[in-house]
Regions:
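N-terminal cofactor/phosphate-binding cores enriched in small/glycine residues
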Residues: 1-6
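His/Asp/Glu-rich, glycine-adjacent segments
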Residues: 8, 13-196, 202-208
Length: 209
């Protein structure tokens, strides 16, 4: 929120990813909004708790709503906050199903992403996915001398948490790239002289994930 609005939490209203709601006495996510349904998700999501405009919103104003604004991220808060209040779509990976999901706040879910979900989403490929070190195991000098067996991590062994594990692995960035390429190929973004915005968020590890 700070990056896309240029403001501090005291102004943009996003004080954390989650906080305690004194009205409901329950934790609340920064992009929760029960007024909007989800696409390919049961989460109710919107940027309505964001109190200031983003540079995506300002681009929409400057182009009289002619600019296209899309956001793709591993997590819903990153996707929605970067798309802003007036974006055309924000998409993130469903950690339970492996499908790319969105929110009805931004209007109709795009046909090309529905097609992607039915043909290429990670749930079709999770069994074959595995994470390996980039270099030969012997090049990692900080490992014990006896560590000569190559390390491989398969997400399928997690069963109930396989997509959560995928989202917090380096391979999620490959998935972000795949769906971004599909968006660039099949949507109208970048196909005229009007400046558009594609906000892409990658995972690099953080305290909460």
């Amino acid at each position: 929120a700070a990056l896309y609005t240029g403001t501090t939490p005291s102004m943009n209203g996003i004080i954390a990813e989650r906080w305690f709601d004194p009205k409901t006495l329950r934790p609340k996510n920064c992009v929760d909004d029960s007024a909007f349904m989800g696409n390919y998700t049961d989460q109710n999501t919107a940027p309505t708790q964001l109190l200031t405009s983003t540079f995506a919103d300002e681009l929409k104003i400057a182009t009289k709503n002619a600019a296209l604004v899309y956001a793709i991220a591993p997590f819903r808060d990153a996707a929605v906050l970067s798309a802003g209040h007036s974006g055309n779509g924000a998409f993130w990976l469903n950690h339970a199903t492996g499908k790319w999901c969105g929110t009805t706040y931004y209007g109709e879910y795009p046909w090309w992403l529905s097609q992607y979900n039915e043909q290429q989403s990670p749930d079709f490929r999770i069994k074959e996915m595995e994470w390996n070190p980039l270099h030969p195991i012997t090049s990692y000098t900080f490992l014990p001398e006896w560590r000569t067996i190559p390390f491989k991590y398969k997400f399928e062994i997690e069963k109930d948490n396989k997509f959560r594990r995928l989202i917090t692995s380096p391979l999620i960035n490959d998935e972000v790239n795949r769906v971004t390429e599909d968006l660039l190929d099949k949507s109208n973004i970048g196909k005229d002289e009007i400046t558009d915005l594609l906000a892409v968020t990658y995972y690099a590890g953080n305290y909460n994930h």
